[in-house]
Amino acid sequence: MKNFFAVCIIPLVVAWSATASAKEGIYITGKAGTSVVNVYGINSTFSQDEIVNGHATLPDRTKGVFGGGVAIGYDFYDPFQLPVRLELDTTFRGETDAKGGQDIIAFGDPVHINVKNQVRMTTYMVNGYYDFHNSTAFTPYISAGVGLAHVKLSNNTIPVGFGINETLSASKNNFAWGAGIGAKYAVTDNIMIDASYKYINAGKVSISKNHYAGDEHTAYDADTKAASNDFMLGITYAF
């Protein structure tokens, strides 16, 4: 992840160096709002001696959680008259949970299992923007970005009637991509209010566990995908 950002920040440094004397282009943004996180494609599979004896695709879950982040970027409009921006962005989001149940056959007996998945995603993106400058203080824009998504999954299973409560955790760094729209309002020459919407796809995270008892082998696998619809309000300061 560090190498990723070391490479991505080079264009910003070069652009800044080219216009350092004018002190124009660099900006920072802080933002907060609601992230509507979608947890989908949720699979839960139990197997015994390599034979699947219980598989379930759990219901998708969409939940609004608090989201926020910071960004540093370079606006090419003032120094170069190009209506584009390039920025590095970090956004965190609250936890989303998805619940369901499945029936399996364990050692010859039917068992119902309550399953709960908790997902949290943080993204580190390189975003590009195209600004539609006009004669007003409002500037609409479109955006697209790629980067890394750190997705954490906590999977809880409770076999009903057995007094067992087990939680497994895993995390994964995935390729992430996104696109969005928004508008900024210039309060002063240096301060802007930014309202935006972005869709971010964070990929898939999975968990697995194996248990051996003599000649018997039981296994459990779970996986889910995550995406977010981010509705943010931010304040930007341009240097």
UniProtKB/Swiss-Prot annotation:
Per the annotation, which location comes first and is thus the protein's main one?
Answer: membrane
Q: Where on the tree of life does the source sit, at the highest rank?
A: Bacteria
- What is the recorded membrane topology of this protein? Multi-pass membrane protein
Q: Does the keyword Transmembrane apply?
A: yes
Membrane-spanning residues = 27-36, 66-76, 82-92, 121-132, 138-148, 175-185, 191-200, 231-239
**One GO CC term, this protein:** cell outer membrane
Question: Matching Gene3D superfamilies, A to Z?
Answer: 2.40.160.20
- Topological domain ranges for the Extracellular compartment: 37-65, 93-120, 149-174, 201-230
Q: Which InterPro entries match?
A: Bact_OM_Invasion-Related, OMP/PagP_b-brl, OMP_b-brl
Q: What induces it?
A: Induced by both low pH and low Mg(2+) via the PhoQ/PhoP two-component regulatory system. Responds to general intracellular signals that are present both in initial and in progressive stages of infection.
The chain's Periplasmic topological domains, given as residue ranges, are 23-26, 77-81, 133-137, 186-190
Summarize the protein's role.
Haemagglutinin that facilitates the adhesion to and invasion of epithelial mammalian cells. Utilizes heparinated proteoglycan as a receptor to successfully invade host cells.
| Name of the protein in its database record | Outer membrane protein PagN
This protein's species is: Salmonella typhimurium (strain LT2 / SGSC1412 / ATCC 700720)
